[in-house]
Amino acid sequence: MIFRSIFKKFSTEEEETKKKSVAKTNSFWFILISASSFLIYSLFHKKRLLGTATA
């Protein structure tokens, strides 16, 4: 906590804005990759269940 307050004291407004922008971009990519991974897993899992039921 001490280091955070010291760092924040010396960081400029531009750096803070850049950090927030990078954080939003990282959040977007995390959500996108998580959602697509879940969809792919769901499709393969469903396909595997259907394949074993018919075999």
Curated annotation (Swiss-Prot):
<keyword id="KW-1133">Transmembrane helix</keyword>
<protein>
    <recommendedName>
        <fullName>Uncharacterized transmembrane protein DDB_G0292078</fullName>
    </recommendedName>
</protein>
<keyword id="KW-0812">Transmembrane</keyword>
<keyword id="KW-0472">Membrane</keyword>
<feature type="transmembrane region" description="Helical">
    <location>
        <begin position="27"/>
        <end position="44"/>
    </location>
</feature>
<dbReference type="GO" id="GO:0016020">
    <property type="term" value="C:membrane"/>
</dbReference>
